[in-house]
């Protein structure tokens, strides 16, 4: 289930992080896809490997006195390693009912490779994108 995906994407050394943009919170993380269970990987078409990274983005709209709600968004992402090589990451939407919307993408990584991620997020109904930037180092076995 998606709850399993959510749990797996927020564990380990790659703790979930977020940035606030007005009424919206963008949650993001990246981890080795080998940390995802076989069942979850199969259900969502994720290739499990120490040399594959998974990036996960979700967008929540915050409303006073109400729990945050997941919203659809246009999400584009790229990753640049420390030698300056940039890779576009193909993001795809994963939904479960109206309660959970995630955007996931994959890229190949090498041991101790560090990436600077740049993610452009435009929530549905908004015209200005939010720019989320973060750095992540990956370890392979």
PLM features per residue range, with description:
Residues 16-54:
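Beta-strand-rich domain onsets/edges
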Residues 52, 72, 112-116:
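Extracellular Ig-like/FN3 beta-sandwich strand-entry sites
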Residues 9-15:
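Sec/Tat signal peptide C-region and signal peptidase I cleavage site
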